């Protein structure tokens, strides 16, 4: 199917059911409960949106949720799509294109991540200051969609400086501090080996996960302001003498969701 037709068909359905929005929030593993904060919420299963993939990962409900939060029209994704699920980068980033079509100007992207920085601890929240990917894929490969942005978009400041400062200020008002660091994306679905983590640390990564980078690339291509928040749910391989598992990821995300919710509430209110 033609890429623009796919985007337009999905956006038409979303507009008919949910209407326009100004802020988009992608909720990562174990963080989907935050969608319950929406007032006058309408939920649209991904299965009812033309051309949308399906969420297959535990902790990803597969719902497009829209409503009002602090007087602003907000759309939240309960679950995202991952390259390791067998989806293309166009599939993974389709929701961001749909957000752009329905009026979203600011994207808050969240994820569960492993701590690469030895000074981090499970339960920390990290503002993403920069990012890199070792997937050898880019969602903008192929014909440029001129309607959204230029052929060669600038990525020198992928994450909005003002929004990062706002996040730190809001956390301080809530009585806790945020980390700030570099997020690295690997393909998954395997967790990284200790050797890969040593490599990532050498490259400057503070946290690692299996998502986020393609969504941010497409968001910036379309001129969106972006704020990224990683929930450090576990220490990466080789730091602690214990195996990694998805249950630990969702358990830690559940443990810190109070801070997570307070942070997002305050940020959205002050945008």
Locate the predicted segments by residue:
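Non-catalytic positions within long, well-ordered alpha-helices that form the structural scaffold/packing
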Residues: 100-103, 201, 220
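Short acidic/polar active-site loop segments enriched in Thr and Asp
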Residues: 105-106, 206, 225
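Active-site/ligand-binding-proximal alpha/beta "capping" segment
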Residues: 164, 169-206, 264, 271
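Zn-dependent metallopeptidase/amidohydrolase metal-coordination segment
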Residues: 210-248
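His/Asp/Glu-rich mid-to-C-terminal helical/loop segments that flank catalytic regions of hydrolases
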Residues: 237-271
